[in-house]
Amino acid sequence: QILTGLFLAMHYTSDTMTAFSSVTHICRDVNYGWLIRYLHANGASMFFICLFLHVGRGLYYGSYMFLETWNIGVLLLFAVMATAFMGYVLPWGQMSFWGATVITNLLSAIPYIGSDLVEWIWGGFSVDKATLTRFFAFHFILPFIIAALAGVHLLFLHETGSNNPSGLCSDADKIPFHPYYTIKDILGVLLLILVLTSLVLFSPDLLGDPDNYTPVNPLNTPPHIKPEWYFLFAYAILRSIPNKLGGVLALVLSILVLAFIPFLHTSKQRSMMFRPFSQCLFWILVADLLTLTWIGGQPVEHPFIIIGQLASILYFLLILVLMPITSLFENNLLKW
């Protein structure tokens, strides 16, 4: 991602007049520019798929008991989401502009300082030149901060050693990383590259929005403003609350709730490997997130509104109430 981004930055201009045409120029005139651009855009999607799988794996096997590692992971998730959001603004298409307008506007819900804060971030009275330039600057610097944080993430993991599916100590079963884990990891990497190259070479625009191929027009709002697929679940939660501040809080909490999970762990066992009821709830949570992702991409009308509201309630209910109670029930089941 950093490499493709670097090569894109060599040809990109962060000025409102030329940003859109510079991206077009990259795709048409730069040698393999189309490849670099689509590797970067779809690489972000693959990145998020990996992140979601990684977080899900951590939830399932109780890896969140490594507090420092887990909290840095949550911080990393926020940083990656911020980076992806700012990157989406750079091509300066319709969805870039209106996405930036809608999401930055959410900050105006903050009491007292809200509207000043939004204008400060915009660098004016609307999303304009100053906004695009600073988003480019932040989009360039953040991945390096993320890389550094990932190093710290690993540092704290190595303090404890990694977890395993059983949730038990595996010190006695340790084997050399190379060749065993290296060869195992190469398989996953190859599968990942296969999916990425298939996406890039066969249907590069599958996950994108056609509205972003229309240059910015501040006077014309697209019929359905929606983010990239990996933000749709959070967007659905945001939209399911009629109050602006409430929606913003729910949006932040939808990710921040991950930080509370270690304190909601009531089970005597670390992993869900031997806890069938918790497993069931975990997969309901996955289904619920897929439902939210679907709802986030739908227009705000019946029956999508009520489905989104129910899915949002279920999301928080599962994590904050049902899973901890089920864990206690399972403890009693085993007479612990």
From Swiss-Prot:
GO terms for biological process: mitochondrial electron transport, ubiquinol to cytochrome c. Keywords: Electron transport, Heme, Iron, Membrane, Metal-binding, Mitochondrion, Mitochondrion inner membrane, Respiratory chain, Transmembrane, Transmembrane helix, Transport, Ubiquinone. The keyword Metal-binding applies. PROSITE patterns: CYTB_CTER, CYTB_NTER. It holds the Pfam family Cytochrom_B_C. SUPFAM superfamilies: a domain/subunit of cytochrome bc1 complex (Ubiquinol-cytochrome c reductase), Transmembrane di-heme cytochromes. Gene3D superfamilies: Cytochrome Bc1 Complex, Chain C. Heme b b566 binds at residues 54, 153. It is a multi-pass membrane protein. InterPro entries: Cyt_b/b6_C, Cyt_b/b6_C_sf, Cyt_b/b6_N, Cytb/b6-like_sf, Cytochrome_b, Cytochrome_b_C_euk/bac, Cytochrome_b_N_euk/bac, Di-haem_cyt_TM. The keyword Transport applies. A ubiquinone binds at residue 158. Its cofactor is heme b. The chain crosses the membrane at residues 1-10, 34-55, 70-90, 135-155, 183-203, 245-265, 277-297, 304-324. It comes from the Eukaryota. Binds 2 heme b groups non-covalently. One of its GO terms (cellular component) is respiratory chain complex III. GO terms for molecular function: metal ion binding; ubiquinol-cytochrome-c reductase activity. Its main location: mitochondrion. Heme 1 (or BL or b562) is low-potential and absorbs at about 562 nm, and heme 2 (or BH or b566) is high-potential and absorbs at about 566 nm. Belongs to the cytochrome b family. The cytochrome bc1 complex contains 11 subunits: 3 respiratory subunits (MT-CYB, CYC1 and UQCRFS1), 2 core proteins (UQCRC1 and UQCRC2) and 6 low-molecular weight proteins (UQCRH/QCR6, UQCRB/QCR7, UQCRQ/QCR8, UQCR10/QCR9, UQCR11/QCR10 and a cleavage product of UQCRFS1). This cytochrome bc1 complex then forms a dimer. PANTHER family: CYTOCHROME B. This is Cytochrome b. It comes from Sorex pacificus (Pacific shrew).
